[in-house]
Amino acid sequence: MQAAGQSGAGRQRTRVRSAPPRRPMQWPWPRGLARPNATGVFLTLALLLGGAGINYPLIQLAIVVAAVVALWRAPGAPGVVWAQGGAARAVLVLFAAWAGLMAVQLVPLPPGLWRALPGRDNAAAVWDAAGLTGWHPASLTPDLTLAGLLALVPPFAAFVLVAAMPRRTRRGALRVLVVVALIGTVLGVLQIAGGADAPLYPFITANRGIGTGLFVDRNHQAALLLIALIAAQVPGVVGAWHTTEGKSRRHIRIVALAVSAVLAIGVVATLSRTGLGLLPLALLAGMAAAAVVSTGTGERRLTMAGLALLAGLCLVLVLSPTGQEAMQRFSGVGDEGRRLYWANTLDAIRAAWPLGTGFGSFVPVYMGLEPMSQLGPEYVNHAHQDFLEIVLEGGVVAVLIAAAAVATVAAAGWGAWRRGEAAVALAASGGLLVLAGFSLVEYPLRMTALGVAAAVLVALLVPAPEAAAPAGRPRRIGLLVVLALSALSQIGLSLVLAGAPSAASRVAPWLSVAWRNRAEAELAAGDTTGAVADAGLALRILPIDATAARVRALALIARGDMAGGARLMGADAALGWRDPPAQLWMAQAALLGGRADLALPHIDALLRQNVGEAALVQELRGLVPAPAGEAAIVDALTRHPGWRQEFLNGLAEDAAAEPDDVAHLLADMARAGVPAQPGETALIRWRLADAGLWGPVAQVWRASGGRNLLGDGDFAGLNGPLPAYAGPYVWRAPPLPGVSVTAGADTGAGGGRRLHVVSDGLGQGMALAQTVVLAPGRYRLGVALAPGAAGAAGAWGWACHGTGTVQPIDIAWRGDGRNGAGTLAVPAGCPAVEIGLLIDSDPAHRGWAPLAKITLDAE
């Protein structure tokens, strides 16, 4: 016994612990549920193509088909998840509640009820003006609400299919997410490297030149990459964590850190401000997910060191030119625009509280209250604050469901932590926080890919079923109904986008856009009867469709029903400023009636949307001579329209023929508190000078805020090379061979703007000049050189405009040699004076002292 014991002890001392045998990774699956390939294909397709947006309905249909196929092959999946109880069952209840709210919004209501709902005044007014009566759902946009209901299918399928997976196989869903994110990262880096013209954008996007990857929007790409960055740190997502030990685990950890580093580069490539702002959160969540499962001091040190290096890499990327370009956008106008959207959305919420306006109704509802001052070429497609948009469209019930969802997810996360799934709990919670952060300024969950990603993260938090869980009872009839409705809707939308509204209205007769576009085509073809009928069908579905109301009104007018058409046009005006043909019609009708004051708001709306600028500016110019027209224009200018400079430039063409009218308009602008600035009237002064009207030149100069005898004496309005030709009160650099004049900031301690004159020593003459209007008399010209300036000071001279005879101005310099002054005497009969810097052809004078300020005062 002793020998045997010693022999056994010896064997124990020399025994080498062997690693468990490597086996191919298996994906056990409960009986009756989908095989993993169906689920994997669906998740991959949804994440790869789900960033396409609403302009690709057939892609959305493909994703829905994949979801239905996966659910078809897993008829018992919902039952398996329901059987888990707790958080899993609560999430299913929340899905049902959200879908139920949408379904209730689609239930037709009697006229007295739906018209009495808050926020339905415009809809009721349009129906009254159009002569329409009958029942209507609570949603103002029932076709879009139905689309939102069908859009729940992919997230629901993702949640059910992943939640029904056994615990050890769930990480496969995260692995799909990380792989797709890496593909998007590589594509995004290639996109930003290739520039705006690179043929690497899979979808039409306004973010060309930026790394949008597999999305149409930079922020949505950044959101997916941040989620994947966190997920990559979960053990088992990158490499077979549970089947390896020691050195192999360290190798896997290094690969996971490298994957996260690549994803961080992709985030920077998006130039997303929100993405960069949430990058630290993603790093912390990934660090926590990796740290909670690290065993041994060496492994923990490797994890912390790697994540510290990753944080350093992110800092370097942020400080790179690409990162700085994104950071500069933090001080841009985007935040100001969003704040305006939020304020307007809050107004809409108050008007429709507590029931909301219906899911999908944001755009037409927002257009109905969008202020004139905020109009622009691009319309507002979302509130850019998803929580506000949910409140607007779903009302108080949506708020309660959303609050319950937050509480359920928080409880599920805590439950996952207590079950020993700390890494998954931290990663999933971190990913959901990233989406919540983006939802504060964007609408990520309205993109199919991110909705599916969110559903996967929630599914990872609920308890996993046992492998032998019952399959449940198939419910395939519902899947067929969903598939049929989705197919008809998406095919109908694709036909609309293809310019076939008649076919679309037959395939999906519940689509208002199909009937509206069909009515527009009929009106253009002269079929007024068909246009009236089909526009009416569009309004029956979507009563606040401004385009459909306008088409029906114009068709009525074309049929001789002037009163009915005008009445409907009046109701259409309350639906906003966004329908250009309606605005043009109302402007023309007001002008024909001699009501310039009524026409100007509609002209203003068109110009703000860059519609018909040249013709409308010409129309405005024709209104200036009439007192009522001028008053209406001044009133429009008080709203600071973007077309103001274009109008003043157009007015320059009339300045020579109607100088008094122009001067009177400028004076009225000043009295109204929106005075023209000197730079805005530069072209007017130039045209007056070309006509020899020097008195009006001075009058316009004073009316536009010109307080000095000389324009821009401190060069504050100048930057870069000066123009060779310019009008009065504007500095110019007359063309001289080998001479350049450039304005720029002073890099020295003095600050301010500086004017630099450089010569090759051969050119001579007036290198810098300005034309001004001066009354006869004596004037004092002051010249200040830049502090510490080196080089020749140059000579100054003046000449009566048109004479060509330059008379010198004797500049007396003070002791410091930087400040000097001289006098000039303007005789009678000199309508305008040219004052300028004279240089000689001395080769020794190549660098002239930079100018800091020029002044001109009467003695």
Language model segments and positions:
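Alpha-helical transmembrane segments of multi-pass inner-membrane proteins
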Residues: 2-4, 13-16, 23-48, 62-70, ...
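Extracellular and organelle-lumenal recognition/adhesion modules and their flexible linkers in secreted
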Residues: 11, 188, 611, 634, ...
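Canonical positions in the second alpha-helix
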Residues: 504, 537-538, 571-572, 605-606, ...
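Alpha-solenoid helical repeat scaffolds
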Residues: 516-517, 547-551, 580-586, 601, ...
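TM-adjacent membrane-interface loops and short helices in multi-pass inner/ER membrane proteins
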Residues: 105, 217, 339-380, 387, ...
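Hydrophobic alpha-helical transmembrane segments in integral membrane proteins
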Residues: 320-334, 475-513
